[in-house]
Each structure stands twice: as C-alpha cells, then as structure tokens.
Regions:
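Short, amphipathic C-terminal "tail helix"
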Residues: 196-226
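Catalytic cores of RNA-modifying enzymes
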Residues: 1-161, 165-166, 212-215, 223-226
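Short acidic (Asp/Glu) and glycine-rich catalytic loops that position anionic groups and cofactors
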Residues: 192
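An accessory alpha-helical subdomain
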Residues: 135, 139-141, 148-189, 197, ...
Length: 226
C-alpha cells in the first residue's frame, strides 16, 4: 500500500497513524511525499509492472479531474478507482451524453472505462462542515485499457490524443454544432464517413462516436497526403 501525500506534516504523521490503528499493515505501507500530478512509473517503480492496482483517494476537489485523467494516462495498469470528490464533480465524471453537465471530463474518462456515482456523503460527517456535498465515484477500466471501439480491424488503435483533441474542440464551443466547432480541423466528408450528423452538438456524442469521427478524420487526412 502506497500513500501519496503532498502536505509534509501529514505525510510525516501517516506511518505513526498506520502503526497505531493498523499495526499489521506497517510492513507493507509506505508514504510518498509529493504532488499526485507529478507521479509516474519512474518515480513510483512499485507500480511499473503489469499487475493491476486500485486507487482509493479523497481527492482535493479543485484538481480531482486532472489527477484522475493524468494517472490513467501514465499508468496503464490502474484498473479501478474509488474516490471521494465534490458531488458536482462526481456527477460530471459519471454523466451520460445529452445532459448539461456532460462534458470533457465525462467523455475523456469514458475512453478508459466506466464510471458511476456509488454514494453521496453529507457535509455533516466532516468537521468543520464544508459548504459542499461529497460523493463517491467507482471507475473500472476496460480490459484493453481503452474503449473497444478504438480497436481497428488491422490490430492498431485509434490515437487517443487525436480523439481528445476533437473532444476539446467540440466542448470548447459547446453551444455550437459540430460542423461549426470543428470546421477548422475536420472536413465534412469525415462526418459522412463516420455516420455522424454535423448539425449535432458535441454534448450529444458518446466516446465511441468521437472515436468513429477521429478514425474517419485520420483516414481523410491520409488520403489527402497520398
């Protein structure tokens, strides 16, 4: 069990707390005093192998989404997480297309796996009580590490960065149609190839539709270069 804690006084006290309340876990517990956004397989070598690991965390609410997406990108073997975040963040992470709160975090997380809100935690369990409610999000990664829709027939995988670039562009102007939001980068024939109506808005697309659009766009670009 490895704890990543940014605050030095807290990191210093953790081993003592574990020794007091979970003495049998002392030998398998270690603390890494650093910012969770800076961890990677090089500075956390315990997690470098292929063994799947689980993340359990009470995440700082303002950086919860970047931490989760960064860790999923860096650690292919992060298989499951159960995290406590602000209720609004939990709703955004687990939302489905078509909702006002469905956005970049929801659709990017769906590239990696499935997320659901599994519990709400009232503010009265904290002291002092915060002015927000909290919730738990349970995430399970797809066996291949990404949505099966990204697997191409030839065994290759649609490029994640390309998919995420489309997502960022579509949600950067979420009130606009896909045609208007993406016209500088995606030719109209790509929509046709992907079977996606360009008059739709980005907030109505599933991750698999973004993948289909990215695949069609990459094929169109290839043809242009030949």
């Amino acid at each position: 069990m490895t704890a990543v804690e940014i605050d030095p006084p807290v990191a210093e006290r953790l081993p003592g707390t574990i020794a007091e309340f979970m003495p049998d876990a002392v030998d398998r517990f270690r603390v890494v005093n650093r910012d969770a956004l800076t961890v990677n397989p090089e500075n956390l070598p315990d997690f470098k192998d292929d063994d799947s690991f689980t993340l359990v965390a009470n995440l700082p609410y303002n950086v919860a989404t970047p931490i989760l997406l960064t860790l999923l990108e860096r650690f292919d073997n992060l298989g499951t997480f159960l995290v406590m975040v602000q209720k609004e963040v939990a709703d955004r992470l687990s939302e489905k297309p078509g909702s006002k709160i469905y956005g970049t975090p929801s659709v990017k997380l769906a590239w990696y796996g499935t997320a659901e809100r599994v519990g709400v935690i009232g503010r009265n369990v904290f002291w002092p009580a915060p002015n927000v409610d909290s919730a738990l999000v349970l995430f399970k990664r797809y066996p291949g590490g990404h949505t099966p829709a990204a697997d191409n027939a030839d065994g290759s995988v649609v490029d994640r960065e390309t998919v995420f670039r489309l997502i960022d562009a579509a949600f950067g102007q979420r009130r606009k149609t896909l045609h208007a939001a993406l016209k500088k980068i995606v030719p109209s024939e790509a929509f046709e190839k992907a079977g996606i109506d360009p008059t739709r808005r980005g907030e109505t697309l599933t991750i698999d539709e973004f993948v289909a659009l990215a695949r069609a766009w990459m094929r169109c670009s290839r043809h242009e270069h030949h």
